[in-house]
C-alpha cells in the first residue's frame, strides 16, 4: 500500500488549506487515483491497524438495503451512530439507494441485483453501474454519499471495479473505503463466476483534516508490510447469501492503530 502513503504525503506537501462543513479545516487536493491488483493481495492498510469487522458488517448492512443502524449496533459497530437519529434512522442512505432506488412511477430498482445479472448476461456492457447519488433524496439523508458511484468492468474473465468518491477523508475514511469496495469486488466476482481483477479508487475532494496531520506524519514513518489474503466461502453463490463468517483474512500483520477524531 505504498501508493496510499505516497498519496498522503502528496496532500501534506501540496494540499490547499480549505474550510469545510464540519468546521475542522483541511488540506485538500482535487482529483487522485489509485489502482490495486486484487491478485496481489487484499488492499488493507498495514501501516496502521484497520478495523475489518466494521468494514465487513457495514458492507453487509449496505447490501441489506437498510436505513437503520440497528444491525450495526447489534454487531458492535458504531461508525454510523454520530449521524443517526434517536431511533437509529439515517434516511435513504447507501443501502436504500443500492437496493431500492425509487422511480417516478412508484416502483423501486434493485441496482445491485440488476448489475449482478447484467454482469452474468452482458459482461461487455458499459452500463455496469451502481449510484448512491440520488439528487432527489439528498436532503433526506443524514449524510450525502461520499463514495457516490461505482462501475464494474469485465475483461479476460476478470472483474474490475472503479469507485468515484466525491469526498475523501484520507486518514480515516479512505483505507476503509478501499477495503470495502475491494471486498465487494471479490464477492461479485465469485457469484458471477469471474476472477478478481483490479479495484480502482478515484477521489474528488481528497483531504486530510487539520486534526489528522500529526497522525498522518506518524504513519508515514512506517514501512508497509505484505498485504494479507482474503478468503471467501466458496459455497456462497448469491450475493445476498454472504454472512460475516464467510470471510477469512489471512496474513494480516499491521503496525499498531493510530487514533484520530472523526469530523462530524
Curated annotation (Swiss-Prot):
Name of the gene this protein is made from: thyA
Residues where dUMP binds: 21, 126-127, 166-169, 177, 207-209
GO MF, one example: thymidylate synthase activity
Organism this protein belongs to: Deinococcus deserti (strain DSM 17065 / CIP 109153 / LMG 22923 / VCD115)
UniProt keyword annotation of Lipoprotein present: no
Protein name: Thymidylate synthase
Subunit record text: Homodimer.
Pfam family name, one: Thymidylat_synt
Enzyme class: transferase
Family, as annotated: Belongs to the thymidylate synthase family. Bacterial-type ThyA subfamily.
Pathway given in the UniProt record: Pyrimidine metabolism; dTTP biosynthesis
